[in-house]
Amino acid sequence: MRRFLMTHLLVGLLTALLVSPAFAQQTRITWWGHSNCSKDLVAEWNKKNPNTPVQYDFFAMTPYFQKLTAALSTRSAADMFTLIDFLLPGFTAKNVLAPIRPEWLGYKDLEDMKKAYIPGALDGYIHKGKLYALPPIASGFSLFINTKHFREAGLDPDKDYPRTWEDVGRIGKKLVKMRGSRMVREGFDFAMHSSTWTMWYFNTTIRQYGGEILDASGKKCLANSEAGVKAMNVRARIAHHYKASDPTVSLGTNALPADDLPKGRVSMFITHAGSVAQFGPKVMKYVKVVPFPQVDPKKPVTPIYGFALAVNPHISEAKQRAVHKVLKHVVNDSKTWYERTSYPHPDKNFLNLPGMEDARKTRYLDVFVKDISNGRFLQRSDKVLELNQAIHRAMERVVLKKEDSKKSLDRACKEIDAALAKK
Amino acid sequence: MRRKTMLRLGGALITLFALFGVWVMLLPYFWMVSSSIKTGIEVFDLPIKWIPDDIQWVNYPNALAKGAFGVYFYNSFVVAFAVMGGNLVFCTLAGYGLAKFRFPHRELCFRLILSTLMLPLEIVLVPTFLVVRDLGLVNTYGGLIAPLAVDAFGVFLMRQSIRDIPDSLIEAARMDGCSEFGIFWRIILPNCKPALGALALLAFRDNWDQFLWPFIVATTDNLKTFPLGLAQMEGIDSAAYHEIMALAVMGMIPAAFIFLFFQRAFVRGITLTGLKE
Amino acid sequence: MGREIGVDRTLPSKIRRLVAGGGKRSLHSHLRWAGFFFVLPALIHLIIFKFYPMLQAFRLSFYRYDLMSPPVFTGLENYNLLWQNPLFHQSFWVSVKYMFGVSIPEWFFALALALLLNRRMPGRSVIRLAYFFPIAMSQIVVAMVWKFMYHPYGLVNTILETFGIGRINWLSMEESALPALIAIGIWRGIPLFGVIYLAGLQAIPKEYHEAAIIDGAGVFQRFFYVTIPLLLPTITFVMVLSLLSAVKVFLNPLVMTEGGPNGTTKVLPYFIYETGFAFFRMGEAAAASMVLFVFLFGLTLIQLRLLRRGGVE
């Protein structure tokens, strides 16, 4: 055993010495991402472009942004990397992203480029009139309902599905199943596992009531306004007035927030288009997707988010140009992305691409794309994560401890204002 | 006579208690193994079915095929063994120096070493990364290994254990004209085997499982370690928990073997503490 | 009886003499520095990879630094911001609760486990391996598995229900979330420190126990007058290290509760990580770390002093 240890030690040290000098390639482009799908696109690219090969490295989601930050701060990041939309302001404020050049992608300018996309779909990536990341996917949230449970409760899933939040509470109540005093099936529930999800719901509802989280300058919290209190009451009412959900149940759910739906533990749940692929065709047979609930269905607002590709500003212009060619290759293959991930592409003509008819019928593509086109990105702020957490805590106090919405939001606004005051 | 039966009864009770404890300790582990042979949908089914109707051994090869796991395992072995080696050598030397010599500022030295345990890695991450970068070690085995090669944990453990060794032994060897290093080699090492075993085991385990540091330092696939491979299974496209669990089971095997191997270090010279009345 | 009293009095002092390191006048003066050379390699390593980064972190605590733009000197502002931030205060106390909640049970249970595994019993090596398994489990897997165990419909509740206790939604109530995480910490810590105690027990020379048996000492007398005094260095180690390792927990709350509900599981390392890498305020994170550092350093010195007074040195 000792010899075994020693040999391995030696092999390790020797390899360490041999591998040390980093590969100094001519025009190798590096890309950090978090999706397996990109791997195949890269392989395809490398076959066609042996002179500018792309080296794709895949990282797990949660710590990925930490690695990215550490790398950007030490100027050792990849040439291009994936970002989630709401982190963009944090990065653009610090000038660590290179602007995307529409002219290198074959558009006349940014306005021309916007016309090729679903209206508003690029807004989340624009800062001071410049585009900083290119989305290969767009996602919104829609309401998923279990049609079996609907029929059991004597409801018609095609007609009786909820349009407004009050509908959600009213219908949700009918879908609840109790055993003694304990709820064994929730009629509806919000995901509670993540402050970002909380903010997607809350930010959207406050906008449905005509409010905003921050004022126009982005320096003052407005979440405790009348609209904010109403938006918070939506959650409180569904839990406490209608008793359509047991909010303590969903916090502890596993890593897949939407998993309670295919397990039959909840009858209605709000989730993203990617869930269609996660649930699989067997579950989707009895799950129907309907539009995101509204305050007033005539003035719809929904949440939208996306992952997008950004360019490292520390590389030469020639290399940036080469990176743009790769970007173009990646975003042009919207159909592959869709088939692999179920996330639609924000392309205006996406629905009319050949081969989409089937998906429109069976995978609720129309519903998703419609919700996305009513979509608005999360409040832009370089303090967005602090905003999310303050609102999440406020929501927990209201929903779990039955604190008054106004009082709870006042405290959240105090926390948010303190965060915004910091440089 | 009565005392003897009492003792025997007590012994049996303790054994029973130990066996009960084993089940409590192992429950999560059973779940892990059971999940690794289910289909993805069954994993989170409740109530739990410990043995699925249709055992999915195929999860294991499928999971391994999802990444360059041969490379990841190899890298983890290299890093874990190298760091373990570094710790065994340097921590034992330092522990001996601190335990058995009185040099000026010894206590200060010890406290300084101990103080390195008191800052979370997150906070020294960027400065440490800068050191590694300036040494040209980013994305190399050296960068993965060097910053971890000495841990104050090990220095402290060895200092405490070497203190137990009677000074008379050292004195006697010194009288016989043994060199200082000779004393270390012939007297100290053989007498602190149990602690060395514990250190080796824990160093191996910790570094087999090391996540954050390799994650920051390794940027290409050929340098990723096993936990990085495990974590990247949890991509947004697919959360394949059955396969993650299959990998997790395989990831435990090396540590279990190392434990069995080093266990002898603890077991040797058994055992008076309990029985033998 | 008289012989037993004799054991009680003489054995500890003999042991004390044997255990007491240093203070040997017979050491030649040239040996004074020999010890330093044994320490030197480790010290050099730590200076490069630990002290230097620590000093950098200390310096950063007086700067405003977002990791991407150059740092700006702001004096004590970061400390002032922390002092005024109720969330920092909350995190600090969560960490203190977690630290003692995990480590104090560990001190006793780990020793009990080591004594247990040091006995002769059927299938001992299998039992030892079984107890060791929780530490062989990868941290990220621990978090994933336990999250599922604590699920409202999960294993823990299934077991409780068979005893007629209703469902408890462990991770979503302020009262139970932290205790639930503490239980995981203990579960994982006991085998770890058990292994160290086991090593310490094995290092006790047989002769002491044999001598004590010849002198007629019973099981408990041997435990208190032989095992405990000889194990004191190991006990010191476990007491100090269990606190230091408990306070660093971070992955479990991150994966299982995101610090919630309402911040009740946001331990200080999580706060630090988040302030630095999510909120991009590295200076403030560094300042928070310095507070943690001073607290832990003070605590450790007190522990070492108390344990020394307890008779080791």
Task: Say what each PLM segment does.
Chain B
Residues 4-5, 10-277:
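A structural signal for multi-pass alpha-helical bundles of membrane permease subunits
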